[in-house]
Amino acid sequence: ANKQLQSINKLLKKTKENLSAEAEMTIKAKSSDKNLLLSATTMLSTNEYILVINDISSLRKLENLRKNLLSDISHEIKTPVSVIRAGSETLNSGALEDKETAKKFTQSIQDNAERLSEMIEDLLELEKIEFSGLVPNKKKMNVLQQINIIIDSLQSLMFEKNIQLNNSISSEHVIKTDKDSFRTILSNLIANAIKYSPDGSTISLKSSISETDITIEIADEGYGIEKQNLNRVFDRFYRTDKARAHTKGTGLGLSLVKQLTNRLGGNVSVESKINKGSKFFVRLPQK
């Protein structure tokens, strides 16, 4: 408190010298720190001060989010861009006479171009969620009907890996939520399960409902996630060493899932054991 009073006195002294002045102050609160903007003006006629205090915590939070986003983009985009540039220069130089080697370079360029495209799409979606402040458009929908639409859109991915899907979602579950966000959440989680599942394995979908919430479980038979990495899988751009070595991806899908789930008033969690697969749980309010 003394520190804050000193800051205010310093501001008023500066105001006396310049007629007006501004200063920022951070106050420790129980839930989170508060960023305040103090604006002071001298009233010459009465020799008094007018002090206006504005809470700019949300503004500072948005600024920090944008800084982090730009930092993430500049860091993560370097790798695919470097591969595309180096591969293109090598091909254009005519140094590769072997067709098979040239084909590998071309495939690498294509893969990294696709990764770059996916990354930009996911980043734009994340930015829209974090900065738009849009209110979810909640309407009644049948959960099974929406999940069946998602499964149909992922059939080609499952066919490539000969993956079976056991869908035990009840046809009676009806909730009020944002349909587009719901589809994005479940599509990302099911696609993620397909990506990290071995060929010929099974993915299971289950649901349970309470008086207020619905919980959807997506279980795979993949390698699993190390215990020390469980609390990081929803971080932006985070991918485990195992994932980086064996699968393509941007590291943004689960971060997008978390942002959308939180936006709908729910949460997402994961349980996993090495060599026993992973289970993701999405809890959403019924209304």
Regions found by a protein language model. Name each.
Residues G265-G266:
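Conserved glycine-rich
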Residues A1-S58:
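PAS-family sensory/regulatory modules and their coupling/dimerization elements
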Residues N137-K140, F159, Q164-H173:
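Conserved catalytic submotifs in the C-terminal HATPase_c
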Residues V143, G224-D235:
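Short helix N-cap motif at coil->helix boundaries in the Bergerat
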Residues D111-L116:
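Short alpha-helical segment of the dimerization/phosphotransfer core of two-component systems
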Residues F131-P136, V174-D178:
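Conserved micro-motifs of the catalytic ATP-binding
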Residues A193-I194:
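Short helix-loop "hinge" at the ATP-lid/N-box region of the Bergerat-fold HATPase_c
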